[in-house]
Amino acid sequence: MVFQKAKERENGAWVPGLWRLEVANVLQMNVNRRRHRTTFRDAALADLALLPIHLDGDTDRHAWDETLRLAERHELTVYDAAYLELALRRKIALATLDRQLRAAAAREGVQLLGA
């Protein structure tokens, strides 16, 4: 359902510059743990490549300042705070199922998709 919604959005979705590494890591860890085969991983990556996803080129520039402050303020991982920082900076809605990140976004006044 999330992928279908992403395909339907004209402008696509913005993600932090670390997104591809996070996705690749999750898929590879599932291969390493024998939960999925490499064919599944590769097919998932091919499907994701078709989505209108835009990588933010400024994620790292904010890592040691605003992203870190958000992580500290809301007790988030720096990785999760990067998504919140991006939503704040670009003034875009945030799509996440993570309860703690959703709460932090609400406190920061960020619109949540699916809310």
Locate the predicted segments by residue.
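Residues that scaffold the ATP/ADP-binding catalytic core of kinase and kinase-like folds
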Residues: 2, 26, 104
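Active-site-proximal, substrate-binding regions of enzyme catalytic domains
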Residues: 24-56, 64-66
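Acidic, PIN/NYN-like endoribonuclease modules and their adjacent C-terminal/linker elements
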Residues: 16, 20, 84-115
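Active-site neighborhoods of divalent-metal-dependent phosphate/nucleic-acid chemistry enzymes
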Residues: 53-100
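Short, well-structured N-terminal submotif of metal-dependent ribonuclease cores
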Residues: 1-19, 30, 34-43, 108
